[in-house]
Amino acid sequence: ISGNAANAVGEKIRKIAKKHQVIAVTHQAILTAKANHNFMVKKVTDNLTTKTVVKNLTEEEIINEIARISGGSITKTAIEHAKELRKTA
C-alpha cells in the first residue's frame, strides 16, 4: 500500500493504539512517522551464529530511517522530507 491508503492505515492504527498496544512491522515511511516509538529490528550473522538485534531509536535515528525507507539514500532532501512527515503525522 502507499499514499492515501498507507495514511488511512496509519490513522486506524493510531486510533487502536489509544486503547491497546500495537506492534507493527513496516517499511512504510508514513507509518513510521506516525508511531510513538520506533524500533529497528536487524538480523546479524557471522560464520557461526545468527542473532536478532532490536534497538529503540532516538528521534534523529527515526528521521534517518524515514529518509532511508522513503528513497534508499539519506540525502539532505530526504531528511527534510522525513522531518516534515514526522511533524505532520
Residue positions per predicted region:
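C-terminal lobe/lid and adjacent interdomain/linker elements of RecA-like ASCE P-loop ATPase modules
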Residues: 4-89
